[in-house]
């Protein structure tokens, strides 16, 4: 009897003699699958570590999202190449037609393999999307910028971690938002990577950064110039280099000023330079430390040009005319390397170095400013020279105040680690801070009394233009930190109402 029912599909004749599964059985494909499998396993493990870790390791992110995915891709390409080559060889052997490719969706085997292939592709695309996003996040992280190239960026990373902007990511200032600056930063970063690999990068890293994004697009996202006004009290503590470390305190009222006409201080204070109605331009050398020419355009459009006397206009200029913005004064808002004199003063004012140790200021500054080839050599010298000084000059102090001397050594080592980097030739002298004028020219780059206009106007050097000295005293710091304050004098005699709260009368509306 003949069965007239439907027959299950059979293997097409062109595929007789081999099965797809056997296409994996070649050295190229097996090698590619092994490489891809190992890479994928490591990616999964490292990604889990990276996601669950409180403090990601820079090398974990580098391997998980950048290095290992490249090996995974190479492995998959090798596997595909091996399958194609094996299939090509067998088709030629069976039919003589290497281009013969047929997929029969009515065939159960073809259906299952197509579904499996599509599923693998979908999973791979999803994993690739996750990995690509994590790679993007990683390359924008402070960990990537500051810790991956440890020896190169160590000074910048250390300064960032101890700055007022420690919680602000590198890209917030160096890149900002938007695709165009992101692309520019990555292109610039590629050039820097090449220099790092070839060991041709400058030591120290050159500043100011060329083509840095304008401060109006970065700094002003948080520090809006229209919301600056008034004055600030600044207290400066200094210690002399004598045996007693004689303290001296200077109190200044810094005339910060502002740029908001609504507050009635649109033309007052230091931030007059950044007033939205004023335009200050200048020419200088590449380091922006020697300014030869200044042009001021006031709110009415009047233009005044000032030229430094005693030199030709632009003789040493290497940059084009630049409009003044935040970073022309605040040029070290994050990567600041404090001078030893300032650092030791702060440590003594905070009693991290005892001010009662003889010659503590002198010895601390001397040991920090000495020349060393490596950080390790410097730390060892600090640990040796300070105890040796007191043992030789003040044997009783060396014996009775051993704890204070050890604390001094520890603090000086901390100061050195955070501010001086001999391997990269970085210290306070290589990166001047333009805020103020105590250790660097800063304000005096323009306010030196030598910049004159054709009409005879001179950029002022009057100290009181920017700050007012409230008092200067010498003595024991705890005695001079607190000054006697004057009692508030009410404009109207209150009589028996002196104990009444201000808000009982002043309600914000019509006065009493």
Question: Where does each model-flagged region fall?
Answer:
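Juxtamembrane/interface segments at transmembrane-helix termini
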Residues: 81-91, 131-140, 345
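C-type cytochrome heme-c attachment and multiheme electron-transfer modules
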Residues: 100-134, 143, 168-171, 175-337, ...
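Eukaryotic non-globular interaction segments with acidic/serine-rich, low-complexity composition
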Residues: 2-21, 373-388
């Amino acid at each position: 009897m003949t069965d007239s029912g439907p027959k299950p599909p059979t293997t097409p004749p062109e595929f007789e003699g081999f099965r797809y599964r056997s296409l994996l059985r070649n050295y190229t494909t097996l090698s590619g699958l092994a490489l891809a499998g190992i890479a994928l396993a490591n990616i999964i493990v490292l990604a889990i570590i990276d996601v669950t870790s409180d403090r990601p390791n820079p090398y974990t992110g580098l391997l998980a999202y950048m290095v290992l995915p490249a090996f995974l891709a190479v492995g998959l390409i090798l596997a595909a190449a091996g399958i194609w080559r094996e299939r090509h060889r067998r088709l030629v052997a069976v039919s003589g037609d290497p281009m013969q490719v047929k997929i029969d969706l009515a065939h159960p085997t073809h259906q299952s393999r197509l579904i499996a292939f599509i599923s693998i592709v979908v999973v791979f695309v999803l994993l690739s999307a996750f990995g690509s996003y994590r790679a993007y996040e990683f390359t924008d992280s402070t960990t990537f910028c500051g810790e991956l190239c440890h020896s190169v960026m160590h000074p910048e990373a250390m300064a960032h971690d101890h700055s007022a902007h420690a919680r602000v990511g590198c890209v917030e200032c160096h890149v900002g938002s938007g695709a165009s600056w992101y692309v520019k930063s990555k292109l610039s970063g590629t050039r820097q990577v090449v220099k790092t690999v070839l060991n041709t990068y400058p030591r120290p890293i050159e500043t100011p950064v060329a083509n840095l994004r304008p401060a109006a697009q970065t700094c002003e996202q948080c520090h809006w110039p229209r919301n600056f006004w008034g004055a600030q009290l600044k207290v400066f503590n200094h210690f002399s280099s004598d045996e007693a470390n004689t303290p001296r305190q200077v109190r200044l009222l810094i005339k910060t000023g502002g740029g908001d006409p609504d507050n009635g201080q649109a033309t007052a204070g230091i931030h007059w330079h950044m007033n939205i109605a004023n335009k200050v331009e200048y020419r200088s050398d590449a380091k922006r430390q020697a300014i030869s020419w200044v042009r001021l355009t006031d709110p009415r459009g009047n233009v005044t040009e000032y030229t430094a006397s005693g030199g030709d206009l632009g003789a040493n200029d290497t940059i084009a005319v630049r409009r003044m913005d935040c970073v022309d004064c605040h040029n070290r808002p994050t990567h600041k390397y404090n001078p030893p004199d300032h650092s030791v003063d702060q440590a003594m004012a905070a009693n991290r170095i005892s001010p009662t140790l003889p010659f503590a200021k002198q010895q601390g500054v001397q040991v920090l400013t000495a020349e060393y080839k490596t950080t390790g050599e410097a730390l060892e010298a600090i640990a040796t020279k300070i105890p040796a000084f007191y043992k030789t000059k003040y044997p009783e102090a060396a014996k009775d105040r051993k704890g204070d001397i050890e604390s001094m050594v520890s603090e000086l080592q901390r100061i050195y680690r955070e501010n001086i980097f001999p391997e990269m030739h970085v210290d306070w002298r290589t990166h001047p801070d333009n805020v103020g004028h105590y250790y660097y020219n800063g304000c005096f780059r323009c306010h030196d009394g030598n910049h004159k206009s054709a009409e005879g106007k001179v950029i002022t050097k009057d100290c009181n233009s920017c700050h007012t000295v409230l008092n200067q005293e010498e003595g024991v710091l705890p005695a001079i930190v607190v000054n006697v304050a004057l009692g508030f004098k009410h404009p109207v005699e209150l009589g028996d109402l002196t104990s009444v709260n201000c808000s009982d009368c002043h309600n914000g509306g019509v006065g009493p």
